[in-house]
Amino acid sequence: MNQRLQRLADQIQRELAVLIRDAVNDPRLTGFVTISSIKVSPDLGYADVYVTIMEPELNDAMTMSNHEESIKVLNKAAGFLRTELSHSLKTRTTPRLRFHYDEVTARGNYMMDLISKAVIKTEENESDEQENEE
């Protein structure tokens, strides 16, 4: 991605984060929406927005159906968000927004949980071995 597209993607990310937080009032969107990254097409026709959604009431353990519902809500609000975004962008056209669930972040969190469990198990085994030696 060239520098111009990257600057535009960064600006869209900043503006969208505020718009989603303040302007999207859909009750089905209950978690905290975090924009992981944005990829803008070279012709500025589309912007693929990758988001993660954290649900504090569920201890961040949202199911895939929860994520799909949240992505549907965001995609339905994409036209409104695009219109609002066009007021702050200094481009002739505003890219169409397509929201996607960012599985990379979720996969990273899953791997961190596995590592934490492995470390705890290793520490337990080491303490058991020390007790057996005594």
Curated annotation (Swiss-Prot):
This is Ribosome-binding factor A. HAMAP family: RbfA (MF_00003). One of several proteins that assist in the late maturation steps of the functional core of the 30S ribosomal subunit. Associates with free 30S ribosomal subunits (but not with 30S subunits that are part of 70S ribosomes or polysomes). Required for efficient processing of 16S rRNA. May interact with the 5'-terminal helix region of 16S rRNA. Monomer. Binds 30S ribosomal subunits, but not 50S ribosomal subunits or 70S ribosomes. It comes from the Bacteria. InterPro entries: KH_dom-like_a/b, RbfA, RbfA_dom_sf. GO terms for cellular component: cytosol. The keyword Membrane does not apply.
